[in-house]
Structure formats: structure tokens, C-alpha cells
Amino acid sequence: MRKKRYVWLKSILVAILVFGSGVWINTSNGTNAQAATITQDTPINQIFTDAALAEKMKTVLGKTNVTDTVSQTDLDQVTTLQADRLGIKSIDGLEYLNNLTQINFSNNQLTDITPLKDLTKLVDILMNNNQIADITPLANLTNLTGLTLFNNQITDIDPLKNLTNLNRLELSSNTISDISALSGLTNLQQLSFGNQVTDLKPLANLTTLERLDISSNKVSDISVLAKLTNLESLIATNNQISDITPLGILTNLDELSLNGNQLKDIGTLASLTNLTDLDLANNQISNLAPLSGLTKLTELKLGANQISNISPLAGLTALTNLELNENQLEDISPISNLKNLTYLTLYFNNISDISPVSSLTKLQRLFFYNNKVSDVSSLANLTNINWLSAGHNQISDLTPLANLTRITQLGLNDQAWTNAPVNYKANVSIPNTVKNVTGALIAPATISDGGSYAEPDITWNLPSYTNEVSYTFSQPVTIGKGTTTFSGTVTQPLKAIFNAKFHVDGKETTKEVEAGNLLTEPAKPVKEGHTFVGWFDAQTGGTKWNFSTDKMPTNDINLYAQFSINSYTATFENDGVTTSQTVDYQGLLQEPTPPTKEGYTFKGWYDAKTGGDKWDFATSKMPAKNITLYAQYSANSYTATFDVDGKSTTQAVDYQGLLKEPKAPTKAGYTFKGWYDEKTDGKKWDFATDKMPANDITLYAQFTKNPVAPPTTGGNTPPTTNNGGNTTPPSANIPGSDTSNTSTGNSASTTSTMNAYDPYNSKEASLPTTGDSDNALYLLLGLLAVGTAMALTKKARASK
């Protein structure tokens, strides 16, 4: 019994092993894990199911084909594996490479690294540039010293918390938001987590930090930084920080960079009164009030925000460097009190009045390019300026800059402005207003459209319309020691409005369009039975207008809607058989040959199978749709003649109709057989099923002759005995007489003509009587037979 139980248990074990594809794995609840092994030689492509990995392993294992089998011993020989850039999607099978110490699977398409979970001999892993999200399988690889996983999809790095031997950890460009696992990795020498980190609590114990750079994450909560009180410099650029309240306690900070975050409220900064260098560029700041008390500030960067009001800066008189570029500034009057400024950026704003800088006499560098400044007279007193960048404005007169003799760097290039539009005419003339530092007019360098210059005017002779004319200027200028080219373009718009008229079958709409512009295409007109082709410059023919490329000329234009006529199908259906014609809208159909149908007369073509309207091929026109016309017929009526021995009656019956059966005709000595299509023989007409053909017919009454009684001998008729045993005296039956032969059951009428026969109205049930020339002969023969019979009977009796 025990032996049988052992065999049974052994069978179950074998079944489990087979079900597990020949692999026995013992995980021991996550401790003392053993790498997987294969128990029998197995084809490579069954172990490594990814085709690309199988090909790589074929080479590593020295095989010729991925279907070749390998043993666990073969797999144990592999210690390093370089498999980068092979398009590998799965590393299934790696769990059998028990002796791996180094692997490189970078630049593949991996998502699942589960097969690594028990490869505890690994010391270095490179799997950057994949699609890995779950790194749980790395949790027990405590021998790892190097781990590179940048450019993946990792969100949870908790499995790394026990990898205390790590000295290199690269996790940038992932989606990590929790770095708590890093708090115990005290041996780390190289760390990057430029990902989506929001929680900085794991940094709480790093109290010796004096400079911290957490750039390029998604940090929004920086409360843990309040514990890093030794911080003197904090660089937290390119994150998602919106609340900087925790920084209020970091009073030792003298440098703070929060460039590239989501800051709107900077109220906390009011307490950081030791700040000397503050970078708040590239945020969403509009209210600068909290900065009003940071009087130690010497350098303030506020570029690329949403600032339109800089009045809170008016009291920061210690400022030497101020950056206000790329904001929404129009009014810069508050800076007029910042008399210690030596460096000021105002470029890429909407400033047209630069006069508030006139009191900043310590300014050495001033940048206000890409604004709308046209008058620079307020700069005349800034004699300490050595760098002036004023390009891309609307400056036309350099005279106020003549006394800025300390300038060494100068930018006045690419001035550009557009004059107010003037109406187009053949001769256009405008004054030149561009002056150099001496006040002399700068002659145009180029003049568009063949224009000419006679100081002080530029003139154009324009035989045809152009939407604008322009001229350029370019002249080297020297101010102080700064030399540059004062250049720019002056554009003079020429306004020209013309009418575009759109015609649709006599209806007109008009749009005003400036010459040189694209026309807005009207809604496509609709015309029954037609397809819109486009807008053309003629009612027929002409050139089609292209609304994507054709521009309004310098004259009124007329555009006509042109259509192509649609074709439709007319289907003619005749008892399920169809033919068709293709006919243009409103065209006449060609009438088909009238169809024929046995027993019917063709009525015409109708728009319904029954009823409907008849199509008139002379006047009815093709509608804007496909149609079906149906052949309709009326049944013909034919005559059926009933012939009874030359006497006839008739019926009129529709084709395929049933005839009304006449009363059966009678004929003396005959029994009526029926109506036949021949006088003799032929086919009997069945009034219940036979239907009227497509022609007149004649049906003939056919009869069968009744049997005749034998004649009597000597003119006497022996008595007959009826069934009751009584005798009946014989009666003479004279042919042609008005008598009855009761023994035969036949009756004869004295009437020998059928002129009055009406088979439908007769009230008699008997056949009509007729004359019969053979009756006398039959009677005599009958009498002779009776006489002979009686004689023989008598003789027989005598012989007895």
C-alpha cells in the first residue's frame, strides 16, 4: 500500500514538473532565493522566447541555430552579456543564467525585468533607454555597485532601498516621484534623479549640505529643505515649485535660484533679508511686492515672467544688476530711483517710453532691444554707459546719443517701423526721417519698386498697384568707442481695396478684398441636378480661381459659379427583367421598344409597378435622381365558342381567366362526354383549371352513343319480368313516334332541331333531341333477336 502511495505521489510530482515546462524554482519566501534551472536540455528559443535575444544567446552559447538545445551547464558558463541595441522586448530566460555578473541591455524595448530577480551575482546593470516601469526584481540584488536606468518609465524606486553597496545610481529621465529609497544609500557617489520627483524628504538627513542642486525634477513640496539650515546656496531650477514657504527659515541663504518653476506667490521671500542674489526668471510671477524689503539685494533676475508692474522695486536701491527682460512691461518709471544700477535688461517687452532711465547715471550696460522705442533723447545724460544694445526698435534719430562717449559696445541694427497706410496712387512720396548722430539725414540704402530719393523725399512711380513700398538705411556710426551699423527698414503700406463679385445664376454677392490678399471662399452653391465645379473668371470656360494661391488683383473681379450637369440612371423593369439608360438631368429618355406579353396589351411605362403616373417620353424630363419605370399591361379578352353539332354560343373571357361551364347539352341516344378542343378526340376542357389562352378558341360538345334494346319477333314483344316477379305487357316502339322505352330508361323528344338551344338559360335537365336514321334498323334487329330467342325456348320445352 505504501509503495502504491509513493508511486502516486511520484506521478503527481512528475506532472507538476511537466506543467512547469521542466523548471524547478524554489523561492523560499524571498530569502535564500535560488536561480531557476532547467532540468533537461532545451532549445534556445524555448528558453529565450524573444527572437532577438534568442539570436544573441545562440551566439553567446556557440550554437548555430536557435533551435539547438542547451543544458543548464551551458547556461552557467555565461557571466557577462552585452545585448544593447538589438530591439529586444523580453528577457525571459535570463533567470537561468545563474552566474551573470554584468549585463548591458541598454537601448532596447524592455518592459519587464522579472527574470533578474534571483540573479544575485550581478554587480553591474545597464538598462538605460528602455521602457521599464517596475524595478521590483532588483530588490534582492544586494551585490550591485552600479545601476544605470536612465530614460525609462520608472515611477517606484523603493526596491532599491536595500542596495547599500551602490556607488553609482543613474535614474534621470524617468517618471520617479518618490526618492525615499535613497535615504539609506550612504555609499552613493554618483546620483541623478532628474525625473518627476516631488518629495524631497529623503534628503532630510543630509544636513551638511551647503549647496543643493535639485534641478530638472517635478518638485513642488520643498518643506524638507527647512531642515537644511546650513544651506547658503540653493539651486532648484526647472521644477514645479509653486509654494516656497519652507524657505522662509533658511535665513543663511544669500543665493537662491528658482528659475523655471511655477511660482506666482513669492511672499515667503520677504523674510530672506540676507539674500543678495535672487533668480526668479521663467516663472509666472506678476506681483513683486514681497521683494520690496530685500534691501540687500544687489542682483535680481526677473526675466520671462508676467510682470507688468515693477513699482515694488522702487526701494531696492542697493541693486546693481536688474533683469526685467521678456515680460509685459510698458511703464518702467519705478526704476528711476535705482540709481546704483549698473546693469539693466529690458529687452523683449512692450516699452515705447525709455525716459525713466534718464536718472540712472551709473548705468554701464543697458539692453532694451526688441521693444517699440522710437525716441532715445532720454539717454543723453547716461554718460557712463559703455554697452548699449538698442537694436530692433523704431529709432530713427541718433542725435541724442552723440555725447555717450564711453560706449565701447553698441547695437543699433535692424530698426523697423511701419508708417500709417496711405492710399495707393501712381506717384507716392514720403519724407525721409532717418538721422545719424550729427543730425544729418541718412540717405536710403535701397528703395523698393524703383523709387528714387531727392532729399528729403523718397518717391515712387507705380504704374500698377503694389500693397506697400519700402526703403532701407544702413550707415556705420561711431559713438564713443563703440562702432556699429545703424540700419533698418521703413515700410509704407499702400491701401487698396477692390471688389470681388460672386455670381450664381444671375444672383450676385460682393466682398471687399485688399489687393494681394487671398479671397475667402464662399460656401459652395447648390443647384439641383448639377455638381458645383468651382468659381471661374468667365460664365463659361475661363480659368478656375484657386482660393489657396490666387490673390486679389488690383482691380474688381467677377467670379462665376460653374456647374456640371449630373447624369442619372433610368431603369426599365419588365416583369423582373431590367434595362437601363443614363440620362442627363432634365434630359428626355429614349423610349424603349414596346415590350410584348402573351395575353396582354402594353399600356406604357409607369413610375410604379401598379398605378402611378405614366411616363411621357415627349415631355417628361429626367429628375435629379435615379428612377425606375415599370411596364404595365392590360389583360386581353378572347372569345370562347361552344359548338354543339354546328350550333354555337360564345363567351368573352380575359386571358388566363376561367370559362364559365355551360349547361351540359343533350342529344337523343347519346350521353354528353364534355367539351373538347376538337370535334373528335382532342383534349377535354377542365373548367376548374384550364385558363383562357391568348387566342380565341372553339370547344366542341362530344357525346357517346347509348346502347340499343334488341327488336321483337312478329311485331310482338314478349312480356318482361321486373324485379318484383310481375310481368309487363310489351309496347311497340316505333321509330320517330312520341313513345317511351321504359325498359332502356331512355326518352326521346319529338323535337329534332336545336335552333332554340341555349345552354346557359335552359330550364330542362335533359339533352336536346335529335333525329337518328339508324334507329329503325336497330329496332328490327332487336325484334328478330327476341323472336329467335322465343323459338329456341319453345323448342327446348317441347323436347322435354
Curated annotation (Swiss-Prot):
Protein name (record): Internalin A
Similarity section: Belongs to the internalin family.
Residues with Pentaglycyl murein peptidoglycan amidated threonine modification: 770
Record-linked SMART domains: LRR_SD22, LRR_TYP
tRNA processing among keywords: no
Boundaries of every LRRNT domain copy: 36-76
One GO location term (cellular component): extracellular region
InterPro entries associated with the record: Cu-Rt/internalin_Ig-like, Ig_E-set, Inl_IR, InlA, InlB-like_B-rpt, Internalin_N, Leu-rich_rpt, Leu-rich_rpt_4
Region (Disordered): 705-757
Species of origin: Listeria monocytogenes serotype 1/2a (strain 10403S)
Boundaries of every LRRCT domain copy: 416-505
